[in-house]
Structure formats: structure tokens, C-alpha cells
């Protein structure tokens, strides 16, 4: 991984490119993220950096976390995340990673926690077909067959059934960075990204490049 940053999803809008074409974009407040720890092979067995993002009142953090930030000489933040970067040696504790680490036209992968949908049936959760609605049909949106009878005498694991939908870690690959607004720490991404407005997202260079 070459570049990575934490951000907050602000919402969606649309912009016009130089040809007058409308592009739907997601606006993300990316950073500034502060480096609070460097992991090394000698001490930790691997190389990585730990970054913090988002303001929070100090009294809402416990003493161990406050001490972790105090050791780095950084004010207490809301989110902490670790990234394995190729050039982690070039970053120092206390250094800020800002939105301009990316450029317009780059491809990125964005991870976040998807919106929770609560308990849903198989039609919405798994795009299952419904049953007949007329001619004496006894099932319409029900699950239908869940498996065979005497053999195997059970329902197989991972059978697609009703249950909780959403609220899971989700990654969307190969999204385009349309525009960077560095003075406001904003990144405009083409299309949608996981999660609700004000939700935490991770932006990193794509693995499909």
C-alpha cells in the first residue's frame, strides 16, 4: 500500500466536467490524519504507521488512550487506524497526512461500514424470487424450500435465509478521484461509497491498478 487516509463521508452531490457532463460524486472530508505511532520490524515484527483522525473531548477517552496520545505529543482524537505503507519510514510522529496526498484521476479503494437495514427477508436481502401471488398459492414472499428431507436431514450452513442486513464492513474497489480541494480537506469520489453520512471511511490506493 502506497497511500492511505481516514475520512468522513459528508454526502453526495453532482458536478460538471469540462465537457458539460454531469458526474455524481461523494464528498469526503479526508484528514488531516496525524501519525501517532510507528511500528518497526525490530520492535513489533512488522512495519506500519498508526494514524488518528477526528476531534473528540478529552474526557471521553480513558487513561490508557490519553497516555498513548500524550506519548506522541498529539491531542486526543476520535478514531485510530493502522496502515502498512511502503514509505512509512518517511513519515514522522506528529506529521499530518492531508487530502492532497491523492491526485485527481487516481483510482482508490474505499472501505466503510454499510448502512444497517435491520431484519430483512430473502427477497430484499438476497434478491430471491417471490412465489405466485394468485391461483391458490400459499406462499408469496416466504423462503420456500430450505433443503432436502431425510437426506441430509438438516439445513446446510450459509443457506441464504432472512436475517440482519447491512452494518458490515464493505469495500468498493477501483473508484475514481474526480477532484481534490486541499484547502478544505475534501476529496470528490465518482459514484457512491459505503456507509451513512458522517460515517468513517478509509481511502487507499487501489489494489487493481
Swiss-Prot record:
User: Which residues, by range, are in coiled-coil regions?
Assistant: none
Listed GO molecular functions? rRNA binding; structural constituent of ribosome
Question: What GO cellular component is one of the record's annotations?
Answer: cytosolic large ribosomal subunit
Output the GO biological process annotations, alphabetical, semicolon-separated. translation
Q: Where is this region: Disordered?
A: 128-163
Keywords attached to this entry? Ribonucleoprotein, Ribosomal protein, RNA-binding, rRNA-binding
Assembly, in brief, is: Part of the 50S ribosomal subunit. Forms a cluster with proteins L14 and L19.
Q: What does this protein do?
A: One of the primary rRNA binding proteins, it binds directly near the 3'-end of the 23S rRNA, where it nucleates assembly of the 50S subunit.
UniProt lists the family membership as follows: Belongs to the universal ribosomal protein uL3 family.
What name does this protein carry? Large ribosomal subunit protein uL3
Amino acid at each position: 500500500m502506497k497511500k492511505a487516509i481516514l475520512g468522513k463521508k459528508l454526502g453526495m452531490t453532482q458536478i460538471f466536467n469540462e465537457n458539460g457532463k454531469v458526474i455524481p460524486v461523494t464528498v469526503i472530508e479526508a484528514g488531516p490524519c496525524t501519525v501517532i505511532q510507528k511500528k518497526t520490524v525490530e520492535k513489533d515484527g512488522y512495519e506500519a504507521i498508526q494514524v488518528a483522525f477526528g476531534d473528540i473531548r478529552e474526557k471521553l477517552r480513558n487513561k490508557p488512550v490519553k497516555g498513548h496520545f500524550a506519548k506522541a505529543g498529539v491531542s486526543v482524537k476520535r478514531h485510530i487506524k493502522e496502515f502498512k505503507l511502503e514509505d512509512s519510514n518517511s513519515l514522522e510522529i506528529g506529521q499530518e497526512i492531508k487530502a492532497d496526498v491523492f491526485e485527481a484521476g487516481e483510482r482508490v479503494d474505499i472501505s466503510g461500514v454499510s448502512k444497517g437495514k435491520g431484519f430483512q427477508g430473502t427477497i430484499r436481502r438476497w434478491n430471491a424470487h417471490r412465489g405466485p401471488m394468485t391461483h391458490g398459492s400459499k406462499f408469496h414472499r416466504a423462503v420456500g424450500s430450505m433443503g432436502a428431507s431425510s437426506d441430509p436431514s438438516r439445513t446446510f450452513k450459509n443457506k441464504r435465509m432472512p436475517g440482519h442486513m447491512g452494518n458490515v464492513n464493505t469495500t468498493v474497489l477501483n473508484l475514481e478521484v474526480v477532484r481534490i480541494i486541499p484547502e478544505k480537506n475534501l476529496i470528490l469520489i465518482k459514484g457512491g461509497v459505503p456507509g451513512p453520512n458522517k460515517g468513517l471511511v478509509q481511502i487507499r490506493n487501489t489494489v487493481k491498478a
